[in-house]
C-alpha cells in the first residue's frame, strides 16, 4: 500500500470500534459491470448498469484517511484483495484480537449487491480499493466526521479480547474463515464457462 495507509496494529486493543469508510466490493463490481455490460443489461436497466460501471469513482481514499486520523483513528488499512472479509481477518491476526462484526452495518451499494447476485459471488470478498478499514476508541466520532464530508462510513463492530472472528447477521452467527482467492477470479471462471443466471 502507498504512504496514505499505515496500519498500526500494535496500538489496537480489545473493545475498540471498527469502522469502514467507503463502500465495499466497489472496485471489482465496477470491473464486472464494465466487462459484462451486455449480460447485465439482460436483467437490469441501462442507467443502473451505467451507475455500476462508475462504482469505483465514489470517494477519495486520501481525504478519508486524513480526516480519520484527525478524528482519533489509530489504524487505517486499504481494503484490497479478498475484500472486507480478508481485511478484517488481517486486522484481527495482526492486532492479536478477536472481532465481532454486524454484517448489516457494512456500507455497500445496491449496485454491488445486484452485480454479485447476477454472477453468484460474495460481495464481501471482492476487492474494494479506495475503501478503508479503520480502528478507533471512538468510532462514532470518526464515522460522523467522514459522513459530514460526504464519505459513507459506519461503525461495523468491535475488537474483542479473544481470538474469535465473529460475523453476525440478525440472529445468525458465523465465524470468519481465513482469506481465500478474490471473488473476481470466480467471476472470470464463471463468464468463461457461461455459468451465470
Question: What are these model-predicted stretches?
Answer:
Residues 1-197:
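Helix-biased detector of long, well-ordered alpha-helical tracts
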